Amino acid sequence: MSSILDIDLDYFRFLTRPLERLNELLGWAGRPVDAVFDHHQEALELWNDAIQKGVIRCPQFILHVDEHHDMMGERPPVSSGNFVYFAMRRWLACSVHWLVDMRIDSPNQWLSAEAWESVAERFTSGSRLPRCWPKPDLVTVAISPGFLSRKLRDRLMKRIGYIRSLPARKVL
């Protein structure tokens, strides 16, 4: 069983105490961030690489910490707006919890009835970590340029321990 903590920094932009929330999440994870990248859809490729390299098994749990659910359609190509749907279709035993404080919409508004039905039982959302959710075997962070101020981004990245001059993707 593998579990992934998937964080998009845009999640923190409307929080009154963003660094404290990031500290809570990383403290709960109990492990360093494994990879940082600019665009959130890069997570899916990285997760596949981690599976192929034997770093993790096919995920059964993804904690998706994001301002958006990233299930805005079921048609290719994979993008930042829909990659969670494609992850759920690829790994049929994978449950996703969308950790969100201010829910602006729902995946069922964007997916066809058939597409939503194929993932709905494995998708939950809320502002709290589900009870007994397994700690992650892999932690990934999307910077998502343009979604938050440079000042906040830099503060969050400093907490993560990431230096912007390094490549956007760490090697697993």
Whereabouts are the PLM-identified features?
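Conserved alpha-helical scaffold segments that buttress catalytic/binding sites
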Residues: 1-172
